[in-house]
Amino acid sequence: MSALFEPISRRTLLRGMATATAMVALHPFSARAAGNQAHLRLMETTDIHVNVFPYDYYADKPNDTMGLARTASIIDAIRAESTNSMLIDNGDFLQGNPMGDYIAYERGMQDGDVHPVIKAMNVLGYDVGTLGNHEFNYGLDFMHKVLAGANFPYVCANLTTGALADDPTKDDLMIRPYLIQEQTITDGDGNKSPVKIGFIGFVPPQIMVW
């Protein structure tokens, strides 16, 4: 593992996840936080599948029930009503319609190019993303060129560049396994405090099947 990351034990990870889950379950959400409380709204997208615009590329006609552009207005509305918020993507954004195939097989991705989906996600101001199985459909070189255009980090803890090491903490990971971001959040009285928020991602083992 790269020296940039300190290994974390499975027990520590599970303990932290259990604590976070309990805190969420025991803390009812209200529209406005109390003076000694702060709410953080986590927004998540998944399975974008290159659907940037409200357009059905298979039917070759507009479809106002789909597209990241429609989601953008919802994201803006949530940010407007939330004192603190973050935007996360769960993966499967790179493949899934004819526009994705055109970029991969016809236009291609040169160094410095920004994929249309990544360009849209940059505009929306994503904080972090992870990979799905369909990010690998066009090969690793294409995927890395696409990820290079993102203005936000990607994490994946179980993607290695070769054989697994006997010691899991020494696996040669392809991208950073996790991220701990320090954010400044505002409570109900307007007081600001720093908090650390952790993100970790995993890909399914069936990548070569799907």
Each model region followed by its residue ranges:
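Acidic, metal/ion-coordinating pockets
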Residues: 2-210
